[in-house]
Design a protein with these regions (language model features):
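Sequence/structural signature of beta-propeller domains
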Residues: 1-173
């Protein structure tokens, strides 16, 4: 809840966002926090490129929860080591920069920095599921990332390469 890009203790940006846990976990206490909200904001889609051990996460329009640094069209990446410890998530690509129109952020009021502060976020309510990125998935060979564009109601394929490319252009779509 709140402005994901806020900084300082006890702000929305300081709250936990990404957790990992062992595959064979059988009791409580095995999950580990790996990222704060300020690095990701609201995310929904997840995809795993096993060869490079990269977890992809897509931004998601959600009421009362702001976007991370990449905005509405962001796809983030986090390298997960063999010990399960990921690197801090970073922006892989904002799909708007490679020709995919997922719409704009419909927020008409700023979200509060304090996650306990009530807010109305009225501009978002009617647009959930109509703007931004929905689910994401990766091809079996790990070379293509598929994204659901809820704004244009399309499925897009992005050639991300395997091993993972470091930059993308419209020709990768």
């Amino acid at each position: 809840n709140g402005n994901a890009m806020s900084s300082g203790s006890n702000t929305a940006g300081d709250k936990d966002n990404l957790y990992i846990f062992p595959y064979d976990l059988s009791n409580d206490g095995g999950n580990t926090r790996r990222a704060k909200n300020q690095y990701l904001g609201s995310v929904f889609g997840l995809a795993w490129q096993r060869e490079s051990r990269v977890l992809f996460m897509s931004a998601y329009l959600k009421r009362h929860s702001g976007f991370g640094p990449g905005g509405i069209g962001a796809i983030y990446q986090s390298q997960i080591s063999t010990t399960g410890v990921p690197a801090t998530p970073t922006l892989l690509v904002n799909v708007g920069t490679i020709g995919i129109n997922v719409g704009t952020d419909p927020r008409i009021t700023a979200l509060p920095n304090d996650p306990k502060t009530p807010n109305t976020d009225v501009g978002v309510f009617a647009e959930i599921g109509k703007r931004g990125i929905g689910g994401i998935d990766i091809s079996n060979d790990g070379k293509d990332l598929y994204i659901v564009n809820m704004f244009e109601k399309k499925l897009h394929r992005i050639n991300i390469g395997n091993p993972l490319k470091s930059s993308f252009t419209a020709t990768d779509v």
